[in-house]
């Protein structure tokens, strides 16, 4: 199927790439169908990806896997919050965090408090709130990206 996207224009999307969020996401409860788009050639070459709504073209959120910005992100999430994901196993769960990218990139943050949890086996997703106060809504990530780039360039 062909879909319109906010940042990539019209693209061809295979049906098996559609994710369903039964309850939508916070602030966009009516938008239930999404896909993940990658800036790079594939998902392995992209640090930042996009959670693109299929129900509202203008809704595309930059997302990142926690391992790119924080060590040991393993919040406790109540089982009842994950019921909509169906049968979950560690090997079929992927976690993403939203990024906030202001014009001053040094102030870029990610939201550790409200991750997206996706069951890759059945393509179901949900967004949850982590109760632990250690996980904040605005976690600075610019310096983390800088350090990562230095490591990849072999400077560290």
UniProtKB/Swiss-Prot annotation:
UniProt-listed GO biological process terms: bacterial-type flagellum assembly; regulation of translation
Main location: cytoplasm
The keyword Cytoplasm is assigned to this record: yes
Pfam families: FliW (PF02623)
Protein's cellular compartments: Cytoplasm
Function of the molecule: Acts as an anti-CsrA protein, binds CsrA and prevents it from repressing translation of its target genes, one of which is flagellin. Binds to flagellin and participates in the assembly of the flagellum.
Oligomer and partners: Interacts with translational regulator CsrA and flagellin(s).
Record-stated family: Belongs to the FliW family.
Name under which the protein is recorded: Flagellar assembly factor FliW
Organism: Lachnoclostridium phytofermentans (strain ATCC 700394 / DSM 18823 / ISDg)
Gene this protein is translated from: fliW
